[in-house]
Amino acid sequence: MRAFCLVGLVILASISTTLATKGIDLSASFNNFSCVKNAGYSFAIVRGYKSYGEVDTVGHQNLKNAKAAGLIGDAYFFPCKGKKTASAQVTEFDNVFGSEYGTVWIDVESNPSTGCGWSSSDHTGNCQFLQDIVNAFTAKKRLVGIYASQYQWSTIMGSASSCAKFTSHPLWYAHYDNNPSFSDYPKYALGGWTTPSIKQYVGDTTLCSVGVDLNFY
C-alpha cells in the first residue's frame, strides 16, 4: 500500500506539471510569438506602462502580435509614484490599450526611475497609491491583478502581511525556483492572499531569441 501511494503521488505530480499552463512576460519589442506558442507557451504578459510614467507603445504592439499568434494576452503596469496621479496614469494607459487585454497586472516592485519610487518610510501612502490605481482601473471596468514578490511587498508595504486590501483581485507572485508549482507559496505568501493565480518561476532567461521571464498557472 505504501509503495502504491508513493507511485500515485509521483503520477499526480507528473499530471499536475503536465497540465500547467505556461506563459511569458516581456518588455522588448518582439514579433515572433508563433515561436513562443510552438515552444508550448499559451500566454504572454506584455509591458503596458513604463516605470518613469509613460505608456509602452512597443508593449501595445507586442500585445497585438501575441494575440495574432494565438496566445492569451495580458499587460503589466509599472506605476510611477510621484510624477503623475494614479488616475492620470491609468487614463493614459487605457487610452491606448482599451480593452484589448485580459487582465492588467499592477507591478509592485522597487522603481529605479527618478522621481517615481515608492516611499521608503510612508508604507500607508504606498498602500493608498496602489489602492488609487486599482480603483481607477475598476472604475473603467477593467480586470485588475497584482504582481509582487514577498520581499518587494514587505519592503514597499512594511511587512508581508501589510496592505491586505486586494485579495479579491488575482495575485501573480515571483519566486525563482525553476518549479512551475504553487507548492512554495505558503512560505512566500504576501498581502493576505491565501491562493495565488500565477507564478513567475524563472526570471531573466531567453526564449526564441528574446529576453523573457517564465510563468505558469
Provide a role label for each language-model segment.
Residues 2-20:
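Cleavable N-terminal signal peptides of Sec/SRP-targeted secreted and luminal proteins
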Residues 19-27, 35, 164-217:
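Functionally critical loop-and-helix segments that line ligand-binding/catalytic clefts
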Residues 103-105, 155-159, 164-171:
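Accessory recognition modules or surfaces
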Residues 113-115, 153-156:
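Short catalytic/ligand-binding loop motif for oxyanion handling, primarily in non-cytosolic enzymes
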Residues 137, 141-155:
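Aromatic-lined carbohydrate-recognition surfaces of secreted/lumenal glycan-active proteins
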